[in-house]
């Protein structure tokens, strides 16, 4: 019998035989060849017999080198016929040479085209084969490889075009009768040589086929393995392009309903509906005519369809981004690309040569490529490539330190690895071990029990699961353990066998695993410490019980404690074999009905995965009662079954499945209890049972010496007190999820210290009979290494697990943070790591691409176009858990635009995960579309694509900015959170670390869905913008003693600040101090709204809607002076408030200055305009909102001579200058040059400004910064422009802008005001009154407070209060005479009572235009459904808060009281260290908005 084996090394010039019988260069990695007879040792190594001339009896066997496992591809020879002999020989040779661990590299001279083409041609022609199913009858189907060689298809099938298996999804192709399906058939049913199985998909489903002949079976196995090998060798860029090409072809074929090879206009329209494209029919027809180039025949061929798809999918967001960095050219040159990569993508060491290589690689246009230019197509290709993916490509390989002790790593672990389904009746399969090991799992579980014929078996004890041989399991583990990586595998043995079969187990382990068990070569410097993964490469560690040291070495066995036996079901859930086997069918039928009832009920709830079912933890509270009932005696099984149908089938009693199941078993069959006996209980029919009232008996078991000696570093021990310091690190403690959660809640710091020195394993509760998974994150927070999950249950928890371990090349080991390995902290604390810098993650969700319809859509592709929104969740420490979502975009799943920023604060980013979810909004809930979960440490900064997991083209485009922050962070929860401080939805506290919550009723869930889903036409409230608060700034801060600000000319304004300056009460919280001077406020405002740009459309500057005043309109200036004794220099620290300005829907919006000033002029031209989000998405000229976080400098008073100085948005030394309004600044970036103390987040495009030293800034000695003026037109001759530099790379040189001068010229912010009323002091400001709620608000159902529950009341025209969250000010209003309302209540009503016309996305935009007439066109009030009782509760709480404030401060209140819960989301605030003057505008004058720094009076609630 000839064979292929590894022989001695060959000389460099040696050769091998090729397919034609001549010798060529060998494959890399092979060191020798033995085939037929042993080859000669001549000069050219020519054998006596060519390898291709195989005898019919010849078989081949491949032994793979160490680290790749032993494939043992034993292939029997072909039949004697000459034709089949040649075909079989070629197939065998190709298989042997090509399938080496799924990857092969061939010499250029090696000619395999003939072999490959023969296999591919045969597969594409197709073969009729029998598909085996679980039933006894197979299905005859015709299987073939598609023309693109990307999918295996078959017919006939009811699935039509969905009847396919992608080559990418195939995990393994195995020959013979190896699958579980084949085992159900008698051995004589099929010829093993004609059988093979294809394992595919995330659940490792098997397709079991029987071919007509062994040659055809071998051809299919060879061809599929070849395709899989090519895919594994394919780089990520080529794979992405191939996937896209295949997707386009597949989409074209599916759209071609009549099969004529072209698409008509009707077929194109149907395809667009399927792709969730909502375009006007005329626009579609126009693009159709432009793409139809072959004499305009009215149809599109494939090439024409590709052109049509390209026109349709041109990315506007990428085009605007390209214009930004190309100086508004339609291409990027190498220098532009270099600047983009350095500034936005935060890449280091970018050279012009590397940029030129990118252009060569991604630019499809030959003309552009020859000129060294990257056009929009090339730029799109680059951003959609792996280089533009959000996942760090460095994390695709092992990059962490692997030399630390094992206890310093998280280790991915599997629970009941052998099961394919639930814990009661599912199948046990050997290939589950192959799947999880290849998926990166490093700890697998084997439940061993005594089997027939002296052979130990593996199955879930006391259940109806099927059984497999222990020997087969060990052989599979040996074969697949180190295919993906060589880091150690931990074999968790749950031993329930007798001593005799334990010896058999030890023999199999030793014989099969061999050297993999030999740990003598592993030496550790410290005997008390565990070895490292690097030292244990290629080793298998047996985790199990070990005989104590006091037992004689000659003893063959001994007794050990069985208390630590993990994963056993509760006593009342055990069904032993024996007499119960006669009633197996009856019990199985009952169990199936119960499980079906549970699964049907679980489908009702919101579910990210339709296959992700969950059965809540079943309370064992009735345990004693059930046991007592079981003692009443036995009765007939038939009677019990009939009596039990009524009690258990109903939905309300379905949760009692375990108890009723236990009851039936105990009554209807001989159920034995094992050794554990609870006090006062009696076992049934069990010899040696305890008498009533005896204490709990300690469980012991006998252990074989041979099996004990295989355990070294991973000795299983019983659970003990985590406060006791462990003596040895060579042991593993197992905790159920319930016990571990209890310890985590009671002793978190001790548990963390415990896990620093030894291993701990967490396993699911025994009540998770449906194999559902718990949340692993709380146990990772405590440093638990092996958090075992049910790999067969795909869903959220497994997605978190995959994301966790993808951060280190999927090797199964992830290094813990340093603080978890040394020292202790409380992971449940609100500030677990005080004094350490935190990370702030700013995610701007820009757009989506090719989002499909939900998988479980009733109408499928014919369903309505989706209304998507994005939800982002941060999962980590409890204090870090939060969840935010964007608004809903109506009727657009192809290219929706969100342009919204979500901000998260993370205390420990090393263990945090970030989860992106896309939902389809539905009137009664939401439908899951897709998700992508990543480790925080794996996220790349800059503009990135987030590809949804398991989807070919679906992605969302985001911008990522990560910055360091310090100080105490509190997430603002909005107006709702001000009064209802419940647990955050994303926090771990909300679900008790994975413990199921009581299930709400259907009506409650429907109400929750309706209330929680974001409104289609309104942006959801943002809760992610943090309020960063610190205590009082140290009086000795830098510069505090050098420069003193001049005293305020208004003593009345100084008093409040001086009074607060020494306060240290919890209410006197300050927004975090900056180490560099910035202006007091930082907010997000729309900067420019631009029309859609095409290649032929120049950028147009937006024009103001109102008349200008001397060429510009600017906000009224105020004298905002820093008078705090603690902060009196240039370093005086203002408050930072992040605020979202709602995007306007008007086509010609008023201009906004960069400093947040309000564009003035009458609003009659725009007040009546309103469009909802649906109509906006259909208007080609829709103007997207471009937001920037900017420092809004303090505005000078009219008498101040201080020159204007423009501060940088990032708090650095750069200066701001305003570009012309149409220029695009669409980015979120965090300056890498910021120091660790820079706590300002730059939510803008690359900063536009000149780098200037502080000394050169005019007016620095006065200790104040002023905001820059606004522009109504780009033609202001008095403004010095900014030149293009590295700090402002996106500046374009426009026609009217001269070169920037060397110095900035001082100029006033606004003309002097005349004719207005004197400014009242802060504590004498008149508060504005509102009418009582209308009748329509009194019949509202309970729910959250919205911005529409109150109607405004406008009276008077003299005095006004300017306060607001949006860009409009409040008109002149006074209280109704004779009505006195408390201040805080009125402010709350004012903040929640209005909506700005034309801005349907902002619920808190305040203030009418012009004369402020009641019910003017500038305001909208939408009807909603809320309860009047909530209004009264809010007002009562407001009054109580005010009374508390008055008691603390006395009756002389100087302003609205502060609510100790902090500022509501979206509200503005005034820093305690500064005061403002509020000028009163003249009657009849254009609206002027006054306030602190932003032209607004900012109220802190």
UniProtKB/Swiss-Prot annotation:
Activity regulation information from UniProt: Activity is stimulated by GNB1:GNG2.
Annotated segments matching region Disordered: 28-47, 551-570, 609-700, 986-1073, 1089-1238, 1273-1305, 1398-1469
Binding site for Ca(2+) 3: 865, 867, 891
Biased composition, class Basic and acidic residues, residue ranges: 626-638, 1142-1151, 1215-1227, 1440-1463
Ligand binding (Ca(2+) 1): 256, 258, 260, 262, 267
Basic residues: bias regions: 662-673
Intracellular or extracellular location(s): Cytoplasm; Cell membrane
Region entry Necessary for plasma membrane localization, spans: 75-229
SUPFAM superfamilies associated with the record: C2 domain (Calcium/lipid-binding domain, CaLB), EF-hand, PH domain-like, PLC-like phosphodiesterases
Chain ranges of the EF-hand domain: 243-278, 279-315
A GO CC annotation given for this chain: cytoplasm
UniProt key word Nuclease: no
Name of the molecule in the record: 1-phosphatidylinositol 4,5-bisphosphate phosphodiesterase eta-2
The species this protein was found in: Mus musculus (Mouse)
Recorded name of the encoding gene: Plch2
């Amino acid at each position: 019998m000839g064979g292929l084996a590894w022989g001695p090394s060959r000389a460099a010039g040696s050769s091998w035989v090729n397919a034609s019988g001549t010798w060529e260069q060998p494959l890399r990695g092979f060191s020798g060849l033995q085939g037929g007879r042993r080859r000669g040792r001549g000069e050219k190594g020519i054998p006596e017999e060519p390898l291709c001339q195989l005898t019919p009896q010849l078989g081949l066997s491949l032994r793979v080198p160490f680290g790749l496992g032993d494939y043992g591809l034993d292939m029997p020879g072909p039949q004697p016929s000459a034709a089949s002999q040649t075909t079989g020989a070629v197939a065998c040779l190709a298989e042997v040479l090509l399938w080496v661990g799924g990857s092969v590299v061939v010499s250029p001279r090696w000619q395999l085209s003939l072999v490959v083409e023969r296999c591919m041609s045969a597969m594409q022609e197709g073969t009729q084969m029998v598909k085996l199913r679980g039933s006894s009858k197979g299905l005859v189907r015709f299987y073939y490889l598609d023309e693109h060689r990307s999918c295996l298809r078959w017919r006939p099938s009811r699935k039509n075009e969905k009847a396919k298996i992608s080559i990418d999804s195939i995990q393994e192709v195995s020959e013979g009768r190896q699958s579980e399906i084949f085992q159900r058939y008698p051995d004589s049913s099929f010829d093993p040589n004609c059988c093979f199985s294809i394992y595919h998909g995330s659940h490792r489903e098997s397709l079991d086929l029987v071919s007509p002949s062994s040659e055809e079976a071998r051809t299919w196995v060879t061809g599929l393995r070849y395709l899989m090998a090519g895919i594994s060798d394919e780089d990520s860029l080529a794979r992405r392009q191939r996937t896209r090409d295949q997707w386009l072809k597949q989409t074209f074929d599916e759209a071609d309903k009549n099969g004529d090879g072209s698409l008509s206009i009707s077929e194109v329209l149907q395809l667009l509906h399927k792709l969730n494209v909502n375009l006007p029919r005329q626009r579609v027809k126009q693009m159709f005519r432009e793409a139809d180039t072959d004499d305009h025949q009215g149809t599109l061929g494939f090439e024409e369809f590709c052109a049509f798809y390209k026109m349709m999918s041109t990315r506007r967001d990428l085009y605007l981004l390209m214009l930004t960095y190309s100086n508004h050219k339609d291409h990027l040159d190498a220098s532009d690309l270099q600047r983009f990569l350095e500034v936005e993508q935060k890449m280091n060491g970018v050279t012009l040569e590397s940029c030129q290589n990118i252009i060569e690689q991604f630019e499809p246009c030959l003309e552009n490529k020859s000129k060294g230019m990257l056009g929009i197509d090339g730029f799109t290709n680059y951003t959609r490539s792996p280089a533009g993916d959000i996942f760090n490509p460095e994390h695709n390989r092992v990059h962490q330190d692997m030399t630390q002790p094992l206890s310093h790593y998280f280790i991915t672990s599997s629970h009941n690895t052998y099961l394919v389904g639930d814990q009661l009746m599912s199948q046990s399969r050997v290939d589950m071990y192959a799947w999880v090991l290849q998926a990166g799992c490093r700890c697998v579980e084997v439940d061993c029990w005594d089997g027939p014929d002296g052979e130990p078996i593996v199955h879930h004890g006391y259940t109806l699961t099927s059984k497999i041989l222990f020997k087969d399991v060990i052989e599979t583990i040996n074969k697949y353990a180190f295919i993906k990586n060589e880091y150690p595998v931990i074999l968790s043995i749950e031993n329930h066998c007798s001593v005799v079969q334990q010896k058999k187990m030890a023999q199999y382990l030793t014989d099969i695993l061999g050297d993999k068990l030999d740990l003598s070569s592993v030496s550790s410097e410290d005997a008390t410490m565990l070895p490292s993964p690097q030292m244990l490469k290629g080793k298998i560690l047996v985790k199990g019980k070990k005989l104590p040291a006091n037992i004689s070495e000659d003893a063959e066995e001994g007794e050990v404690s069985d208390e630590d036996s993990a994963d056993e079901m509760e006593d009342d859930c055990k069904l032993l074999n024996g007499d119960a086997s006669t009633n197996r069918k009856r019990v199985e039928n009952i169990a199936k009905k119960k499980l079906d009832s549970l699964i049907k009920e679980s489908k009702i709830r919101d579910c990210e995965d339709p296959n992700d079912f969950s059965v809540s933890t079943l309370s064992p509270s009735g345990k004693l009662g059930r046991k007592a009932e079981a003692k009443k005696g036995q009765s007939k099984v038939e009677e019990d079954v009939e009596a039990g149908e009524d009690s258990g089938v109903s939905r309300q009693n379905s949760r009692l499945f375990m108890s009723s199941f236990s009851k039936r078993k105990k009554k209807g069959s001989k159920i034995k209890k094992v050794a554990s006996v609870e006090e006062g209980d009696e076992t049934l029919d069990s010899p040696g049972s305890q008498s009533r009232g005896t204490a709990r008996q300690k469980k012991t078991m006998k252990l074989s010496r041979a099996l004990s000696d295989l355990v070294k570093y991973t000795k299983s021990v019983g659970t003990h007190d985590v406060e006791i310091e462990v003596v040895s690190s060579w042991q593993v403690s197992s905790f159920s999820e319930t016990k571990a959660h209890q310890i985590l809640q009671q002793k978190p710091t001790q548990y963390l210290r415990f896990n620093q020195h030894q291993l701990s394993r967490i396993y699911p509760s025994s009540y998770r009979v449906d194999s559902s998974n718990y949340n692993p994150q709380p146990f990772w927070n405590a440093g638990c290494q092996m958090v075992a999950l049910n790999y067969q249950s795909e869903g959220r928890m497994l997605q978190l697990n995959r994301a966790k371990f993808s951060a280190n090349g999927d090797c199964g080991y992830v290094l813990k943070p340093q603080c978890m390995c040394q020292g202790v902290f409380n992971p449940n604390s609100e500030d677990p790591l005080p004094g350490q810098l935190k990370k702030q993650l700013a995610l701007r969700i820009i757009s989506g691409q090719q989002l499909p319809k939900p998988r479980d859509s009733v109408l499928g592709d014919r369903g309505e176009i989706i209304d998507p929104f994005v939800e982002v969740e941060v999962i980590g420490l409890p204090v870090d858990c939060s969840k935010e979502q964007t608004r809903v975009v109506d009727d657009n799943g192809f290219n929706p635009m969100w342009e919204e920023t979500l901000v998260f604060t993370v205390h420990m980013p090393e263990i945090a995960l970030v989860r992106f979810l896309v939902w389809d909004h539905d009137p009664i809930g939401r439908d899951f579309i897709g998700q992508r979960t990543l480790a925080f440490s794996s996220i790349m900064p800059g503009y990135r694509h987030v590809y949804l997991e398991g989807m070919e083209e679906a992605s969302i485009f985001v911008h990522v900015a990560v910055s360091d922050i310090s100080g105490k962070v509190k997430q603002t929860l909005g107006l709702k959170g001000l009064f209802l401080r419940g647990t955050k939805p994303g926090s771990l506290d909300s679900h008790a670390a994975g413990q199921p919550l009581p299930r709400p009723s259907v009506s409650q869930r429907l109400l929750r869905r309706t209330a929680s889903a974001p409104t289609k036409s309104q942006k959801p409230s943002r809760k992610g913008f943090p309020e960063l608060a610190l205590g009082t700034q140290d009086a000795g801060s830098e510069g505090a003693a050098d420069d003193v600000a001049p005293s305020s000319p208004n003593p009345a304004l100084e008093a409040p600040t001086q009074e607060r300056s020494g306060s240290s009460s919890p209410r006197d919280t300050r927004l975090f101090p900056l180490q560099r001077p910035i202006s007091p406020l930082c907010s997000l405002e729309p900067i420019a709204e631009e029309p859609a740009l095409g290649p032929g459309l120049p950028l147009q500057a937006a024009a103001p809607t109102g008349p200008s005043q001397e060429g510009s309109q600017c906000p009224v200036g105020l004298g905002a002076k820093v008078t705090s004794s603690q902060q009196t220099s240039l370093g005086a620290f203002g408050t930072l408030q992040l605020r979202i300005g709602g995007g306007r829907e008007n086509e010609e919006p008023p201009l906004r200055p960069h400093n947040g000033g309000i564009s003035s002029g009458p609003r009659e031209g725009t007040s009546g305009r309103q469009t909802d989000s649906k109509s906006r998405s259909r208007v080609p000229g829709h103007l997207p909102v471009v937001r920037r976080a900017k420092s809004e400098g303090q505005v000078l008073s009219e008498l101040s001579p201080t020159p204007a100085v423009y501060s940088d948005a990032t708090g650095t030394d750069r200066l701001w200058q305003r570009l012309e309004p149409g220029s695009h600044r669409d980015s979120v970036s965090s300056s890498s040059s910021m120091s660790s103390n820079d706590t300002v987040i730059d939510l803008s495009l690359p900063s536009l400004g000149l780098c200037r030293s502080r000394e050169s800034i005019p007016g620095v000695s006065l200790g104040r910064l002023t905001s820059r003026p606004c522009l109504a037109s780009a033609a202001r001759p008095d403004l010095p422009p900014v030149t293009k530099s590295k700090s402002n790379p996106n500046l374009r040189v426009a026609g009217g802008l001269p070169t920037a001068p060397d110095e900035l010229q001082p100029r006033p912010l606004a003309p002097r005001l005349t004719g207005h009323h004197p400014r009242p002091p802060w504590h004498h400001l008149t508060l504005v009154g509102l009418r009582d709620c209308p009748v329509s608000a009194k019949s509202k159902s309970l729910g959250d407070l919205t911005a529409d529950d109150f109607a405004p009341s406008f009276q008077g025209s003299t005095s006004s209060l300017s306060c607001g969250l949006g860009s409009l000010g409040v008109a002149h209003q006074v209280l109704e005479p004779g009505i006195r309302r408390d201040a805080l209540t009125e402010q709350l009503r004012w903040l929640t009572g209005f909506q700005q016309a034309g801005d349907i996305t902002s619920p808190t935009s305040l203030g009418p235009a012009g004369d402020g007439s009641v019910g003017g066109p500038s305001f909208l009030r939408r009807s909603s459904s809320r309860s009047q009782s909530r209004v009264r509760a809010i007002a009562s709480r407001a009054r109580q808060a005010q009374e508390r404030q008055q008691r603390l401060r006395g009756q002389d209140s100087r302003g609205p009281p502060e609510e100790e819960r902090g500022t509501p989301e979206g509200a503005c605030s005034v820093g305690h260290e500064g005061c403002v003057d509020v000028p009163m505008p003249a009657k009849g004058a254009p609206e002027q908005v006054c306030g602190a720094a932003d032209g607004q009076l900012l109220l802190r609630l």
